[in-house]
């Protein structure tokens, strides 16, 4: 850490170990299954978030009816995996109605072009509390030549591309994906997929409007190495960063398993806040978040127009921060937030207004934050979440300043199961309660 951080006074400090990266290990679990490589036993001993636990269990399941919980990632990646590999009929289901509305139809259509036998059930009414999502039948994805798929305009999820890329080396002739749009949604996550595949020995090439994947197999030794030392989740690290930036008293948070330099696209949260990773690094795998330094830094910043098309999951947290700091800003590239675990656009507007802030949303211009001081609020302030984990976590720090009534606080289990434990640990050391 830079010497400018050093101070003679004692600052309350806590250490946090974040859950393993969802973006890395959801992909690596599927790659390991395709390579017929056992997942190291340590993964079965970890307290995983729901997203990773679903993919870990379901990707190796021999059951005919498999629940993907509330995980859109698992739903899409497993759909492609089973379309290629299953030797039995598989039905993916979910106990969550919202999952029937999440993006999947585009992936099904593209897999069908490759010869897969799969379809969404005609009725998506629940059976014994489970909503049917997609039925997959065994077939052989044999092609006479190199298949070329053209992605539909208005792609709803980058995971459609990731799902196809992950299985592409195991198609007889590989795969070409083409697209017409100038920019794919969450392109940084597609780049992550390509980087992991290349690290595991796959030959692929990318140009402005397409990706070619040669037939091949994932390197088992590389997969074993990548799966042997779990790396912390940058999409979870945004929340301790937010705590440091909103904490009512000085503190330091040590994130013990998050490298500053990471393939994870969510690490770009630092760039969006104009924070250099060099300011935070104490070792290869530890970040130190100093609240006094970070708060001073953010108070001095101005924000104009930002594109979050590559980092949509950071939008709720960033908006909450900018509202708290009364920053005027425009945030673009977020139309697909309506298709997430909730309609995040509607909930961000609702919760921001409940907390007394002025903000609007237009399709062309995105979110516009007025940058004004909040009006007075009536407590307890209701925070609507629709069981969306990111809606719970993004607004929780306001409980230092208002009595909040947060819906479904347990939704954090989906991605950051120790969220409340870690936040309350911070509350103890700074001797400030949460008003929840």
Model-derived regions: residue spans:
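Short, structured segments at the rim of ligand-binding sites
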Residues: 1-436
């Amino acid at each position: 850490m830079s010497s400018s951080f050093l101070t003679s006074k004692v600052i309350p400090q806590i250490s946090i170990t974040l859950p393993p990266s969802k973006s890395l290990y959801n992909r690596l679990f599927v790659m390991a299954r395709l390579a017929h490589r056992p997942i190291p036993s340590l993964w079965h001993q970890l307290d995983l978030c729901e997203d990773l636990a679903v993919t870990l269990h379901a990707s190796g399941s021999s059951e005919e009816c498999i629940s993907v919980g509330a995980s859109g990632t698992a739903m899409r990646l497993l759909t492609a995996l089973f379309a290629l590999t299953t030797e039995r009929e598989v039905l993916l289901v979910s106990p969550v109605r919202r999952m029937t509305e999440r993006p999947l139809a585009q992936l099904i259509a593209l897999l069908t072009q490759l010869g897969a036998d799969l379809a969404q059930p005609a009725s998506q009414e629940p059976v014994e509390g489970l909503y049917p999502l997609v039925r997959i039948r065994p077939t052989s994805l044999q092609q006479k030549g190199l298949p070329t798929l053209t992605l539909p305009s208005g792609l709803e999820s980058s995971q459609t591309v990731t799902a196809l890329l992950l299985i592409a080396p195991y198609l007889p002739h590989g795969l070409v994906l083409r697209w017409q749009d100038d920019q794919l949604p969450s392109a940084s996550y597609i780049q992550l997929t390509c980087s992991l595949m290349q690290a595991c020995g796959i030959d692929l090439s990318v140009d402005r409007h397409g990706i070619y994947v040669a037939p091949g197999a994932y390197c088992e030794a590389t997969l074993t190495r990548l799966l042997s030392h779990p790396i912390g989740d940058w999409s979870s690290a945004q929340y301790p960063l937010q705590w440091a930036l909103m904490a009512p008293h000085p503190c330091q948070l040590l994130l013990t398993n998050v490298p500053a330099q990471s393939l994870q696209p969510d690490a770009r949260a630092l760039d969006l806040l104009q924070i250099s990773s060099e300011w935070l690094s104490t070792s290869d795998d530890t970040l130190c978040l100093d609240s006094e330094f970070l708060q001073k830094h953010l108070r001095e910043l101005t924000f104009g127009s930002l594109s979050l098309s590559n980092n949509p999951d950071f939008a709720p947290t960033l908006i909450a921060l900018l509202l708290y700091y009364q920053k005027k800003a425009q945030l673009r590239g977020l139309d697909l937030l309506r298709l997430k675990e909730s309609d995040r656009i509607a909930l961000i507007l609702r919760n921001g207004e409940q907390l007394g802030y002025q903000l609007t949303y237009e399709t062309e211009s995105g979110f516009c934050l007025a940058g004004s001081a909040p009006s007075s609020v009536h407590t307890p302030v209701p925070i609507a979440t629709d069981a969306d984990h990111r809606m719970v976590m993004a607004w929780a720090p306001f409980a230092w300043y208002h009595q909040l009534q947060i819906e479904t606080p347990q939704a954090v289990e989906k991605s950051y199961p120790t969220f409340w434990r870690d936040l309350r640990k911070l509350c103890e050391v700074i001797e400030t309660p949460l008003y929840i």
